[in-house]
Amino acid sequence: MSLEKASKAAIVADNARGQNDTGSPEVQVALLTARINELNSHFKAHTKDHHSRRGLIMMVNRRKSLLSYLKGKDATRYRDLIVKLGLRK
């Protein structure tokens, strides 16, 4: 259920603020979003996989807390990230 190395590197490069940035909230949220989307497709085939569902809920909550942190620190970066990832309507 993890991302492939190439796709993870592409996500990091696309959302990084600097050259060696892998830990900024933008990168972390983008990686979590990709993993969440992967798990959503997994649950379409495996509806009774409750163990993985717990992991999904933990990832969603982690993403939520990172987004609220980013919103408090810099609202423009938050809005740009939301639009870029298509998280809100």
Curated annotation (Swiss-Prot):
Give the superkingdom in one word: Bacteria
Q: Which terms does the record give in the GO molecular function aspect? A: rRNA binding; structural constituent of ribosome
Gene Ontology cellular component list:
cytosolic small ribosomal subunit
Q: Which Pfam families match?
A: Ribosomal_S15
NCBIfam families registered for this protein in UniProt? S15_bact
Function according to Swiss-Prot or TrEMBL: One of the primary rRNA binding proteins, it binds directly to 16S rRNA where it helps nucleate assembly of the platform of the 30S subunit by binding and bridging several RNA helices of the 16S rRNA. Forms an intersubunit bridge (bridge B4) with the 23S rRNA of the 50S subunit in the ribosome.
Family to which this protein belongs: Belongs to the universal ribosomal protein uS15 family.
What protein name does the entry list? Small ribosomal subunit protein uS15
- Species of provenance: Janthinobacterium sp. (strain Marseille)
Taxonomic lineage of the native organism: Bacteria, Pseudomonadati, Pseudomonadota, Betaproteobacteria, Burkholderiales
